[in-house]
Amino acid sequence: MKIIKEIISWMTYILTAFVIAMLINVFVFQQSFVEGHSMEPTLQDNDKVFVSKLINIYHHELEYGDIVIIDSQIELPRTIVDDVKESVENNLITNILFGTEKEEKFWIKRVIGKAGDIIEFRDDKVIRNGEILSEPYIKEQANYMSVKKFVVPENHVFVMGDNRNNSRDSRSIGSVPLNHIIGKYKFRY
């Protein structure tokens, strides 16, 4: 009987630790990694990054130049259930026990435009609200084929990769709803 109580006690501790880890992963921070070359030279393929999710809790406004993780499936609604499901699927314990399946729906990009901004591309330059952006972080001179204008709707941001000639971003999927921002990049390790 004592052994059963000991096992139940240990299982309770393990379950409690798992629940706390899940809550932290859903609401506070998570680790992620860069897959691909779209954020070079700022971030490299396979860089591990620390992502703060506090912007979602405190509704902090994103700033121009912030690097964010987005859910690129902007045509689908996103809820807290998605955050919990992804936390269960993408945590260390699940990865050790079952391996990982890489999903390409999460992208890491830089905020270029916020609600109400007009984003244009002319003469291989990004223009926000009539002003050419100074972008020392981009990999190389970009070749923009379009002279299309984008107006960023309310509760959305316009994001782009730093490697402009090798990036799928708001130029192809449109502005990203704020509820599709998973978190804000803090540092790599």
What are these model-predicted stretches?
Residues 1-189:
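Extended hydrophobic leader/signal-anchor segments used for secretion and membrane insertion
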